[in-house]
Amino acid sequence: KDGPYPTVWTPASSTWIKLLNAQLAAKDKPELINGTPESLMVTPVVFAMPKPMAEALGWPKKPIGWKTLAALAANPQGWAAYNHPEWGQFTLGKTHPELSTSGLAGTIGEFYAATGTTSDLKTTDLTNPKTQQIVKTIESAVTHYGDTTLTFLNNQLKSDQETKTPYVSAVIVEEKSVIDYNKGNPTGKMDATNLTPPRTPLVAVQPSEGTLYSDNPYAILKAPWVTPEQTEGAK
């Protein structure tokens, strides 16, 4: 326990609420969310790529998806296959799926793309050898596996300012983070001043197979420590 118990939980995605409910159900415990949470804002989870790299893959005219990245990751020529040997191998930045919304959404997106389905994933989908091979190929390109996207974007901006080689070829982030980065504000601080935009901007590429959204739910907790007055006040 760190501080007072919360009355409201606002995770970046409703996916975390579903995971919590599943864990509670497995222990025969009641759900902690009161009603259906409202969404405060919505932003898609995208591939953030240095603009020249995205253009080399055909952006914005040609669709780019998880399978595009898998094929590039598996190609021993790396970026040389797209006439840019100076960029080396394709590298991916991705946060830990147990700690970060974009990392979780990215992992789910990989499996959806690998199976080609848009309906609920089944255990047989996840254990399919072909599916697992595609996901493993994508994950093999992950050279930086951090805790938050802010770490990646800070390092990307530092690399942009100091060298001509991008920190990573692509990083999985929320679209809003791309907007902030291109302003020279990779941490997204509301009161940031004296910003210097990057020399090479990032572009937000929505996976052609489809993407998940961070819906930022406002969830009022239905817990023993929450009083009726607190519940009413939180509404």
Where does each model-flagged region fall?
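Active-site-proximal beta-strand/loop segments in catalytic clefts of secreted hydrolases
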Residues: 11-13, 50-51, 94-97, 173-176, ...
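Periplasmic-binding protein-like
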Residues: 34-47, 132-142, 146, 192-231
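Ligand-binding pocket segment of bilobal, Venus flytrap-like solute-binding proteins
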Residues: 109-204
